[in-house]
From Swiss-Prot:
Residues 1409-1467 form the VWFC domain. Disruption phenotype: Homozygous mice for the PXDN gene show completely or almost closed eyelids with small eyes, having no apparent external morphological defects in other organs. In addition, mice show hair color change and the tail color is white and also have a white spot at the ventral and dorsal region at a frequency of about 94.1%. Some of mutants have severe cataracts in the eyes. Highly expressed in the cardiovascular system. In the embryo, expressed in the corneal epithelial layer. In the adult eyes, expressed in the corneal and lens epithelium. Expressed in lung. Belongs to the peroxidase family. XPO subfamily. Glycans are attached at residues 387, 637, 696, 716, 728, 961, 1175, 1277, 1364. Its main location: secreted. One of its GO terms (biological process) is response to oxidative stress. It comes from Mus musculus. InterPro entries: Cys-rich_flank_reg_C, Haem_peroxidase_animal, Haem_peroxidase_sf, Haem_peroxidase_sf_animal, Ig-like_dom, Ig-like_dom_sf, Ig-like_fold, Ig_I-set. Binds 1 Ca(2+) ion per subunit. The active site is at residue 824. This is Peroxidasin homolog. Residues 243-329, 339-425, 430-517, 518-607 form the Ig-like C2-type domain. Processed by FURIN and the proteolytic processing largely depends on the peroxidase activity of PXDN. The proteolytic cleavage occurs after intracellular homotrimerization and releases into the extracellular matrix a large, catalytically active fragment and a smaller fragment consisting primarily of the C-terminal VWFC domain. The processing enhances both peroxidase activity and sulfilimine cross-links formation.
Amino acid sequence: MAVRPTRRCLLALLLCFAWWAMAVVASKQGAGCPSRCLCFRTTVRCMHLLLEAVPAVAPQTSILDLRFNRIREIQPGAFRRLRSLNTLLLNNNQIKKIPNGAFEDLENLKYLYLYKNEIQSIDRQAFKGLASLEQLYLHFNQIETLDPESFQHLPKLERLFLHNNRITHLVPGTFSQLESMKRLRLDSNALHCDCEILWLADLLKTYAQSGNAQAAATCEYPRRIQGRSVATITPEELNCERPRITSEPQDADVTSGNTVYFTCRAEGNPKPEIIWLRNNNELSMKTDSRLNLLDDGTLMIQNTQEADEGVYQCMAKNVAGEAKTQEVTLRYLGSPARPTFVIQPQNTEVLVGESVTLECSATGHPLPQITWTRGDRTPLPIDPRVNITPSGGLYIQNVAQSDSGEYTCFASNSVDSIHATAFIIVQALPQFTVTPQSRVVIEGQTVDFQCAAKGHPQPVIAWTKGGSQLSVDRRHLVLSSGTLRISGVALHDQGQYECQAVNIIGSQKVVAHLTVQPRVTPVFASIPSDMTVEVGTNVQLPCSSQGEPEPAITWNKDGVQVTESGKFHISPEGFLTINDVGTADAGRYECVARNTIGYASVSMVLSVNVPDVSRNGDPYVATSIVEAIATVDRAINSTRTHLFDSRPRSPNDLLALFRYPRDPYTVGQARAGEIFERTLQLIQEHVQHGLMVDLNGTSYHYNDLVSPQYLSLIANLSGCTAHRRVNNCSDMCFHQKYRTHDGTCNNLQHPMWGASLTAFERLLKAVYENGFNTPRGINSQRQYNGHVLPMPRLVSTTLIGTEVITPDEQFTHMLMQWGQFLDHDLDSTVVALSQARFSDGQHCSSVCSNDPPCFSVMIPPNDPRVRSGARCMFFVRSSPVCGSGMTSLLMNSVYPREQINQLTSYIDASNVYGSTDHEARSIRDLASHRGLLRQGIVQRSGKPLLPFATGPPTECMRDENESPIPCFLAGDHRANEQLGLTSMHTLWFREHNRIAAELLKLNPHWDGDTVYHETRKIVGAEIQHITYRHWLPKILGEVGMKMLGEYRGYDPSVNAGIFNAFATAAFRFGHTLINPLLYRLDENFEPIPQGHVPLHKAFFSPFRIVNEGGIDPLLRGLFGVAGKMRIPSQLLNTELTERLFSMAHTVALDLAAINIQRGRDHGIPPYHDYRVYCNLSAAYTFEDLKNEIKSPVIREKLQRLYGSTLNIDLFPALMVEDLVPGSRLGPTLMCLLSTQFRRLRDGDRLWYENPGVFSPAQLTQLKQTSLARILCDNSDNITRVQQDVFRVAEFPHGYSSCEDIPRVDLRVWQDCCEDCRTRGQFNAFSYHFRGRRSLEFSYEDDKPTKRARWRKALSVKHGKHLSNATSATHEHLEGPATNDLKEFVLEMQKIITDLRKQINSLESRLSTTECVDDSGESHGGNTKWKKDPCTVCECKNGQITCFVEACQPAACPQPVKVEGACCPVCLKNTAEEKP
């Protein structure tokens, strides 16, 4: 019992000790951690606590986080003794001023965050003591001025952010002490760019040249250079004027204690700063109170002393330059004086063998002693020729060449020693350094004779021919280097040429001979002949030629030029080798020999025999196609699940969603092509395994893989055959007037030309490694012309990406935007449906392989993105056209792989209406029967936005933090790519509905289909007119428009299809016109409150239109802001190469690298082949490119990347070509674009200028179209625009009221007819009777000839009244030619025969009492029924008679068609619903 109390006592004692320990710990924590703050080790976080002052923290604190409080000021010493502090976060407070000593004792602070406060001023010594500071963030404050000494105490500062403040001016030298600077941001300030800011421009240029630092600063004022980078500003633009001296000082003698004045006045812009020099050293007025600089620049020296004696000079200096006065001397009269020069030696020229004297004398007390040395301070040689005169001069007799050089005169006494230097320039006889060589050239060429010489003085080069003066004409030119250039050499130019080097000493001469050979047109030395070969063999077609100059040999197959590839090889002499011949290679081959004199051609026919034998792959067909269907479908389904079941997770997902086809037919066609090619790949692998050979080697022939009958079987099972379209162009009433949505039947002879979902055309034959489907560069080790191809990403970072842009002084950003909008009317490549490789289903971005369909863009080892762990960028190949890549459309041969254009090639507003009937129906408002397009939400302006797309989560809902607004729905699925493009789609959707409503008012008898198609026709014509009359002339320039030529009418032999190189490389030049910022401007052309949008934030962001002001601010930012100038050294801004589709924690894409990779994927031949195609000179060395790419820096980069000119990819080469004056294109790019746009125009039967498409009155009105008018009519509230919105104009003087912009008068589309109630209805009772007349002959000028009218009258007389009972009709027969009687008689006989058949049919039907209508339904005699709401039919005596109800004019302005009613009615509440 005694033990228990003891235990209780012990227990109580332990409890007391525990409580005491806890109290001690708590007290220690309380002392170091402020109330309500979170403290962990040396980190203190006091966020969102409404603090108004800096709390006290422990001295060992390394991170102090005071964000999101209400701190208004920082007291000096607030952080005293926090010497361990490394990071200080004070952003998002209310600090207004940074006082001196605010950060005392923070010598180890590295990171200081002060952004998003209300800071207005910073004291001069505010950051003193921050010797370790590396990063300082002051952006988003209210700073207006900066003291130049504010940052001089920060030797280690690497990053300084000052953007989004109110800084207008910067004092020179503000950042000059920041030697460690790597990133400086001054953008989004109100910088006034005048002469005072040129020091900053020089600093930014220094940063850019060194490459060690990045900086951003843009001008806000004056308006004419608003948005320009400060680095691009020049003194000339700002009218800066160098100083000029207006009053000079004079020599002065003074005694001790007096005052002396040296006068100096200067003028300049800006006002020059006056600086005084004494003995070439700047005087400091601060260190000597006796020195004063007066307001007018005069130097006043008070209480003169002996130390003031010397040579004075005034220097006037400003940002544009400097000027100096003459030197004046201040002599101090008194005790011992230092030496001063009375006469200084001067530079002297002397002839060899003559004598020379350099004078030198000085004064001082005591009298100075004169001595001489050479310039390097070595004593003069002991030479009897060299003497010093009694006055101190240096005298040299019989001067030799070795006497040339620098000499120094020293004047010394007991007080001081001074010296002066001069040169003796010994003049010598000329000596040649470059001598001309004899040349043999061909008549008409240009020849250079190089000649250069040296001597003293520099000799002059003079040329003679045979001792006589050269002809005085433009052909003979002596360049400044001394080279003689003879242009267009003629036979009489042959002879001896003398180069003479002449100076005052004498002359030298050297001769060279010119031999001129006459020009000779190409003559064939060997020619090919018709040949028949077996499939799978290699064949060589001989062709060689002779001529002067030596001809170049090219080959064409069926009109398309052949290029070097795995399939074709052209030897140096011109022989064409075709590897692995298949039936696809059969055809006509033409060998063309060209030189500057002319050309010659010869052709042959190659026939290919296909022996009926089994092939190695036949046994594997069945199993391979089953496996191919399974693997392809599995990969596609996996991709669809990944993309459509959740939000986009990465830029890869965004790109895939953006490009993924939505039309079921497109998906089916792409799937079939993938299955077909995958099947043959599997067969190839089986054969390779069975034969144990390398099928990738050149010895294996693909045409031996599978026999033709099995290729047809694979085509059927894969779905290729099922997806062949059968075109029906029989409805000529429609096709003669309107376009189909898919582009078919435009060319009636070739209905598929230019249609959607067809293969791109080719200017040159495709280039694949294996000749069929393997891209160049897929094997990174394979050499081309002795060099491996560079990675596309390396080309992008080395050659294309740029952070510096130059504003276009002529054209607005709308020039770029129209180009992109137009491009989306012309082409869209169908990419692979799967993001995973077919072999094992792994995602392409994770495996970084080239297994189909993957073709990853590899990242070079030294790329900045390697740090994030990325090895590649996502990329999948484009889907092949069914039957290409492995087989022909006949499914019996191997054809090179071709790609699918998802759009119609014609300029037909397919981006507004869609390229298939399925797409067109999805965007039409079919319910209203008014011919309108569907509309979305209506804004405050009363105008609607585009409708929202429906379906699974889309690319527009990529970020949960942004507004969950889905994508807009338009005719092209890329409408949401960026906000500027979305605004253009909105404009044209509104334009359709505006025109449709107007046409329906003018023609209330038209049904919805008529209104829709007439409006679509007008909108397409407007886009054509804007493109060819307003946009193309600015892109092509005068030279390019001449290449395009005038419109001469429709040519059915021209294929208007888009050629592959245009879509894949050439028209992507527009990427170089894109600004990194989308500007948003209000009605006063000032930034809207939400600000501008960086490009990487403008992708897939429709919520910014819905929630942030609509389309008007974006449109003003397009036509009210200068575009990006296309400069070969400033191509794609880094928003496109480094932040494309960027998302958090992911690797963004690179548009330039994607463009290059896509070109290789599509088998686009190298740049050199297109040069030859465009009749530019062949370029076999990089020096040969100097005429088109003048920059030696760019040529050196190309050589470093590609090694050979024959390897250069087309896209980067087109981008770096120098612009043809007056255009925005280089010569090769101009050739390609003018070719494509000429084909688009001339090969379009329904081109708006083609006679008969529109009436003359309608065409006149259409030519009033302008994009300015479209903006005025369809924006929310834009009231002022330029007449030409593509050209830069100054607001408001260069802008016009919308009332002054010409408009299209739609009244010329009003029907003038007696039968209007049915004339405009597609499905009306009389459509088949009156259709063709109303479509073709609505206007007086369009009426046919007399005989044609008689034939039509006959057709009406005998055909119309019988067509109720017959199915045959003759309205579509072509009329006989006026002079062709035989043809006329034959046609009449045919009409009579058909009429007899109709009569017989009518008689048989009249014999019965029942009637059978057009749908095959029987009706009893004397019965009536409604065929449609407006038509009542009656069966009487076996004859059907129908009556159409006539509609009375409606009593309201906007009648509505109600389902089931014939005529439009007025709703009772129509007036009440009006706003």
